Amino acid sequence: MELPCFEPRLDADQAVDRTDRLTPTSFLLSTLRSLLGRSDDADPDVTVLYYPDYLAYTTVTLRRVGRSDKDDKFIAAVDAATGRVGEVDVTLPDVETREVADERVVPIEYDEADAEREWDEWLFSYVDRTYRPIKQPETSLDRLELVYTPYYVVDYGPDEDRYAISALTKQVELLEDIPPLADAYTAPASRA
């Protein structure tokens, strides 16, 4: 299946390197092992999974007393697997089309109508908290776009931790902390 995906900001080897640096102890141990040539640990399994998000291109028009109106544009993201919403606070890379096996894609639980509804519920409190308007501002959803973020799942084996590294933000998290990603990884077809 062809998917619109963010261009990754790191590759699989860099993702594995990031898991070695989670704590000073793990970093020192991995460095010491490699210096002494004692790296008896097997290389971890690395799997790429694709996580769906809707990008909501938003315009807010603030009505300011005694001054002209002010337009502010920003991007919000609606998690297509859980429905969570938040402002995008990173510079987004280019979107490219990739051919991806179906079993590597986290299933979408929220369609466009659901995503728009979640965005609308989130937007009022966000605008109130961010802009502190005196008058109710006008808001509009300029465009809603589905895009997939590549995640590297680094699996050190059954008795060790498994990590999910975002190819967009380079953030490392335990795989179990992202339930839709963990479910997609443990599905038999994705590990084939």
Region spans (language model):
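Charged, low-complexity helical/coil segments in non-catalytic cytosolic or luminal regions
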Residues: 1-152, 156, 160, 179-192
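Short, acidic, Ser/Thr-enriched surface-loop or helix-capping motifs
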Residues: 166-167
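Hydrophobic "anchor" residues
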Residues: 171-172
